[in-house]
Amino acid sequence: VALLVIAACQLMVVLDITIVNIALPHIQRSLDFSTTSLSWVVNAYTLTFGGLLLLGGRAGDILGRRRVFVFGVLLFVLASLLGGLAQNAGQLLAARALQGMGGAIASPTSLALISTTFREGPERNRAFGVFAAVSAGGGAIGLLAGGVLVEWLNWRWVLFVNIPIGILIALATPRWIKESERHPGRFDITGALLSTVGMVLLVYGFIRAAQDGWRDALTLVSFGAAVVGLTAFVLVERRSRQPITPLHMFADRNRAGTYGIMLCLAAAMFGMFFFLTLFVQNVLDFSPLQAGLAFLPVSAVIAIGAGLASRFLPVYGPKPFMVVGGILAAVGLAWLTLTDVHSTYAGSVLGPMLVFSLGMGMEFVSLTLMALSNVPVRETGAASGLLNATQQVGGSLGLSILVTMFGTANGNEAEKQIPRFLRQATPVERERFQRTGELPPPWSDEVLTAGVSAAFIMAAIFAVLAALIAVVAIQVRPSDLQRLQGGAGPGPG
């Protein structure tokens, strides 16, 4: 029962990264988001989640993991309620940020609770296996669940669905999970705030550039403030006795390379889900449920890639899988750039999506191993937490860069399509366009497809960068694996 409670919490947190993707077109129409600002629905969650993840783990150590776990779950429930009731874009984004905060408190604590609740050996290993499976499959489950909820109810239920789940978790936790010992320590709140604010400003700068151009004053101010904030963050962490981000983790070449690869791959992955969801619903006219089902093969092929990597890692080592995985991801994304308004799911989307997923499956197993390589048991929680935080921050930053590419290509294509539309439009269509500024299909489909293709080009570049980092930075032979795994046992987090 304890494992069920912990796994349910992790599923709820992971699921919310993707469940809103299917609802994005409906959220856009309901709350009047622009296509470029729509990415904040994803980024508001992932930025606070990634930025505060390590602080959440530290809070569990100092205040007691069960207590902090319940608080994080209840905060997540409250944020889900507020998000479901949102009447405008600002209210929804504030609720999504609050959700990310709740997830950042609950998620690292739930992993640590496995270490304190289950005995070392097969029992604990089985628990970690269930936790990992839920973490890996949660994204695909979120897409399918989002499709069902939007199709049968409305977009608000992708948030409301968390409320009964969270309440049951909060009620069951005191009965089935024991409180852990408290460990004295300090909260590096300054470091957490500087890193989160710095990343938010950086992401805002890219999204602002997509809307108003690179010379816009607020765009430049955002980038400047982001540089100041992130520089201050590094200086604070170097001087802190108990930093939220242990900078010595980056001293190891292999581990630093691993974090760089995760940063690039997360950018590619978040972009693929975000823009492909828009494409299949707006251009291919898939219903929300059809869109959710369209992504189901992703999780199956990721599992196949992970299985292949796990089986042959002892023979070849992690580096070949990190290189090949990045190349496969890049090939899949480059293939997706060929989609146009005449594309079909089976002919133009499914194939590249499967190639991309196979590469990602190979990558994640290798990245997890390398992130925990040569790490003392007492620091495994920090190492794994840093990998998770890198994934969330990389996804947010990468998505904002892709949105910039999307917005630029969108605007260029619109300049081509508007004259064509005006030549062929009826008086009623012209009047509607002058009133709303929105092109109708098929002209709007051409504009969206041009933007999506540009975003996929940038995503493919991120995947190529991941492969190049693996070639240059990762230096592990198969004979080193026994030594690496010896220091990577589950830690208290």
Locate predicted features.
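Transmembrane core module of solute transporters
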Residues: L3-F49, N154, T190-G191, Y204, ...
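C-terminal module of multi-pass small-molecule transporters
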Residues: L63-V73, A86-G90, A94, A106-S110, ...
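C-terminal membrane-cytosol helix-exit motif in multi-pass small-molecule transporters
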Residues: I163-S180, T196-I207, A226-S240, A466-V476
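Short, Lys/Arg-enriched, Gly/Pro-containing loop segments at transmembrane-helix junctions
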Residues: R182-R186, Q242-H248, N412-Q417, P478-A488
